[in-house]
Amino acid sequence: MIKYLLSVILFTPAVLFSQIDTETVYYGKDYFIIEGTIIPVSEKESPYDRLPASYKDIVREPVWDLSKSSAGLAIRFVTDSPYIKVKWEVLNNFSMNHMPDTGIKGVDLYYKNNNEWQYINTGRPKGFKNQYTLIENMSNEFKEFKIFLPLYDGVKNIEIGIGSSSSIEKAKNNDKQPIVFYGTSITQGGCASRPGMAHTNIISRKLDLDVVNFGFSGNGRMEQPIAELISNVDAKLYIIECLPNMISP
């Protein structure tokens, strides 16, 4: 009898967690806005690219490949869910010996607390396809959240998981003029421990502005196609930090 009761006690939580998990509903790009980009989704190969598809045959191959990394991009949404989960799939599953995987291909959750962005948690990657519970046990009023995307890998897909009885909707667009960065690996986010700690993302949070990141590791070389692209933006400020990459081809 004692052995039977112990089994019930041990396995009941597992059953409860399983039931909770099956009630999670995941929502994709139609339920959040994508920040950190000046290019309409219709002009990209993927919503999480940093250059338009038309640039594939215009820029050098390394620049195009690096533009597939989602550095500086974030998704923003409002939900009344008591918990937030995330599923995301990366393009390359990169790893480097000088930068944590959480910075390369992880995701960061922030909460807008009295008009200031407060760090909540980091989704730790394990491979191409990842799933992580970012926060639990919240109250049920609507709150605004932002998730910063990987710095040195691309995103094929990302979905937000919330309770089946909860709602999710797009946050309001930030109508302020953006800040545009063009530069090197430093701009792209190397070697931040997690996406939210790239300096462009820190500036975005502190000023509550959309910041566009055209950092291309080893390839920020003041090239004409990128100059033409950013010159079409009515930006509050342009920050060009290409000097470390200004070498002969």
For the regions a protein language model found, what residue spans apply to each?
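Short, histidine-centered active-site or binding-site loop motifs used for metal coordination
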Residues: V90, G183-I186, C242-P244
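N-terminal secretory targeting modules
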Residues: L16-P178
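Serine-esterase "nucleophile elbow" of acetyl-processing enzymes
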Residues: P100, N137-S139, F145-G220, Q224-N232
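Proline-aspartate-enriched helix->loop->beta-strand connector
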Residues: I230-I240
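A generic structural signal for short coil/turn motifs at secondary-structure boundaries
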Residues: S95-N97, Q188-C191, I247-S248
